[in-house]
């Protein structure tokens, strides 16, 4: 992974990349620590660790008290171009890191990291599939934890407990300073049409401190329940959405659900390398309009 990033650095004529975010440290080092990873375009990457102090020091692992000690191990004065995680950090942190390289111009390393991470190795693909397999196994147990008289929040808590019992780490990271989520979302009744301030396809009223998902709606006969929970059974996530019914639903609900499944399968077949995302969207919209279902497309016009 480091070598892939070094190739990208050389292609962009950037001499080094500084990584500080937890998720990218995990991706590149296999663990999370307080400190930074310095990746030169040529040569070995260097870890500078503030906490914990339990890592054994070596030629590439250094214990530090503050990031300014980077210059004790690297000639920071000769670097002319450095990439920082500009989309991930506070302005003050970025300024502090820029002072480490007084003669450098700075570039956004977030895009480089994203470009490297989007290419999955066979091992990474298998890790994702294993997470999804475990996720599916848990979803098959969901009907067993439903009890009459529950609210949507009661039901969601039981599902969250079920997922944790089967190995979910329970932590879910969202990219973006204004993005937040817990383990997922459960929507039922009119609450499913409530818009959210977050950049998710669906909303739900939630609570003021987390306006997303369940809101203590009583679950009743004839109600559809959408369960959209994230699975974290390793280093990769899976995101699985299923719709359940409490008893029988109106025939229109089954028709629209079948239409959604058809669109899903068609997009899988059409989404090839080089496909236009806009055209895939427009084709789905044409199919929905032809089926007289535009008012229901993507859940709600408010979202």
Regions found by a protein language model. Give the residues of each.
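Active-site neighborhoods and metal-handling regions in enzymes and metal-associated proteins
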Residues: 1-303
């Amino acid at each position: 992974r480091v070598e892939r990033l070094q190739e990208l650095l050389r292609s962009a004529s950037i001499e080094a990349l500084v990584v500080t975010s937890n998720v990218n440290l995990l991706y590149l080092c296999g663990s999370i620590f307080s400190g930074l990873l310095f990746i030169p375009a040529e040569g070995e990457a260097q870890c500078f660790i503030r906490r914990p102090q339990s890592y054994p020091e070596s030629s590439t692992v250094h214990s530090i008290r503050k990031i300014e000690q980077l210059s004790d191990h690297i000639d920071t004065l000769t670097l002319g171009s450095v990439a920082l995680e500009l989309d991930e950090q506070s302005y003050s942190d970025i300024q502090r890191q820029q002072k480490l390289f007084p003669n450098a111009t700075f570039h956004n390393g977030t895009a480089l990291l994203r470009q490297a991470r989007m290419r999955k190795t066979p091992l990474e693909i298998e890790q994702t599939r294993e997470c999804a397999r475990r996720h599916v196994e848990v979803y098959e147990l969901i009907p067993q934890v439903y009890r009459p008289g529950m609210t949507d929040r009661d039901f969601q808590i039981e599902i969250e407990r079920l997922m944790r019992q089967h190995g979910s780490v329970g932590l879910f990271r969202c990219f973006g300073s204004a993005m937040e989520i817990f383990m997922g979302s459960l929507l039922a009744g009119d609450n499913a049409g409530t818009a959210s301030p977050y950049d998710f396809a669906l909303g739900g009223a939630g609570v003021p401190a987390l306006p997303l998902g369940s809101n203590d709606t009583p679950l009743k006969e004839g109600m559809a329940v959408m369960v959209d929970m994230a699975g974290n059974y390793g280093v990769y996530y899976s995101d699985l959405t299923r719709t359940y019914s409490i008893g029988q639903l109106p025939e229109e609900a089954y028709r629209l659900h079948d239409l959604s499944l058809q669109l899903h399968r068609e997009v899988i077949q059409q989404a090839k390398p080089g496909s236009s995302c806009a055209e895939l969207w427009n084709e789905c919209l044409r199919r929905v309009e032809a089926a007289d279902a535009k008012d229901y497309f993507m859940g709600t016009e408010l979202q």
